Amino acid sequence: MEPLKHECGVAMIRLLKPLEYYQQKYGTWMYALNKLYLMMEKQHNRGQEGAGMACVKLGGKPGHEYMFRERAEGKNAVTEIFGKANANFKNLTPEQLADAKFAKEELPFAGELYMGHLRYSTTGKSGIQYVHPFLRRNNWKAKNLCLCGNFNMTNVDEIFEELTKQGQSPRIYSDTYIMLELMGHRLDREVERNFVAAKAMEMQNTDITNYIEDHVKMSNVLKTTMKDFDGGYVVCGITGSGEMFSMRDPWGIRPAFYYKNDEIVVVASERPVLQTTFDLEAEEVQELMPGTALLVKKNGECSVERIMEQKGDSACSFERIYFSRGSDKDIYQERKQLGEQLIQPILKAVDYDVDHTVFSYIPNTAEVAYYGMLSGFKKYLNETKIEQIANLDHVPSKEELYEILGDFVRSEKIAWKDIKLRTFITEGNSRNDLASHVYDVTYGSIEPNVDNLVIIDDSIVRGTTLKESILRILDRLHPKKIVVVSSAPQIRYPDYYGIDMARLEEFCVFRAAIQLLKERKMEDLIEQTYEACKAELAKPKEEQINPVRSIYKPFSTEEINEKIVEMLRPEGMTTPIQLVFQSIEGLREAIPNHKGDWYFTGHYPTPGGTKLCNQSFVNYIENVYHK
């Protein structure tokens, strides 16, 4: 499918021992820095537009830097930021490089707290100023805050408006920056609360500072800050005084995992990242529950605390279908089941002619679902063989057994993805010609005009790649029929929690439904839905419902599929094409513990999601449909 930009990746490490401990046990005081690099590289799939890292050095002397940050843009950002950090060590002697005490006192990025972030922009904004972590500085260590996260907030407009009403003038319009300012303000209040308490105990000077740093409660800061936000998020932060936290949204939309022992506390967006980096079993890695925060105090005391009541069970199902790496043991099985569950509709599509059907997949994220599909067809053929043998009225001969048992699933590597072709040629026909060559095929892999070709993808969003590249190149093999299978259901609604698909008109399913309404003289339903959405937008977001769902009600999945085929069929192509989508029921059966399916069903977990969906339909009508 078209590559989707999606939620970012986070990584955090808190060392619980002095640097000398890691030098002695692991041969380097850079243990955490090296592990952070591995954690970020293992999550490169989550962000290729930029990366950043930050470090806090505990116990730094006044006049010496204790917070360090590097950020960079581009696909090589991870290598670049670690290259910059390591450049500080290139002129050291071997003795200095092995001296943890020297490193602690003199070197940048020789600290106890580390944070990393990989960025994918889903807002269209670019520039180094949008790359995490964001940093808020102050002369008081406890008031310094470094923030990063995997999130998209739906109510930034409302919060921005509230801030400007108060007389504030935020320098950058982004959810991260606004969160940084809000959280920084609440952190200031928390520090001042402890300052007052210390003064009441008649403390003076550095005794007050030490008291503040020992008694700051980040849970108070999170409770007063995060209640204002609507969206899916994992928010991570470190303070100059040594507090560390990671909080997950109360709907459980975005994922976070952690591990702790007597040496380290670590956080990542995906479980296998921690397993591989720290050689752990899956059972040793804990999932951060919705509405809770992992908190590590300056003294290393670690706890998980509830910040907000859980508001739902809406973990993103797209994480399991597409975004997360398939190396997670549960995700691997779920993706296989998504493929296996599609056997019956595929059989129907090829008229049960398995002997003359070749199976393949669109590289690369559909590979695991493909294995599941093959497994399902192997089971189907085995059952067919058993039934054939059982129905014989005699003991089968060797030749008969060979004929029956000789049936097998014909799987081939049909599609190959070449290097990503840049659309630097602006003239339309040339660009289309370039796009058509993103994929290549294995010539001679099917029997022309005899074999059906079944090819599975993880999902179909816009349909652009199908129309401009995949269908054209597959047609060169001259199959009898092409069946394109999606392991995900039809994507019908926008996402506002971190996936780059916020406009209805981008979805081939939505465009097909609108076209069907036009062809059947049902335009009144479009206008009624428009008026209904405007009426909903006049209400508080907490009271809004989603009228956009009515657009799809007149049609079956098959009717929409047929219209999509008609719309995406390349000019001049005559080979029969059929689409097969996963059902909602099949999705829930394969992925029972991740119930966030708003892009398929229109059931948004937060009020802000429903509001923005209504706004998206209004925008479509006013900016596209009525034009």
Spans of features found by a protein language model:
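Extended, hydrophobic alpha-helical segments in both membrane/secreted and soluble proteins
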Residues: F359, A366-M373, F377, S411, ...
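Conserved short alpha-helical segments that host acidic/polar catalytic motifs at enzyme active sites
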Residues: M1-M289, L295-V358, I362-P363
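Conserved hydrophobic/aromatic pocket- or pore-lining residues that grip, position, or stack substrates
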Residues: L294, L342, F359, M373, ...
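Active-site proximal loops enriched in glycine and acidic residues that flank catalytic Cys/His/Asp
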Residues: G237, R248-D249, S269-R271, K298, ...
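PRPP-dependent phosphoribosyltransferase catalytic core
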Residues: M226, S241-E243, R248, K260, ...
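Phosphate/ATP-binding catalytic cores across multiple sugar-kinase/actin-like superfamilies
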Residues: D228-G231, E334-D355, V368, M373-G376, ...
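Amphipathic alpha-helical
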Residues: A197-V216, F377-D393, E400-I414, K420
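Terminal amphipathic helices with adjacent charged low-complexity linkers/tails
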Residues: G300-C316, Y361-V395
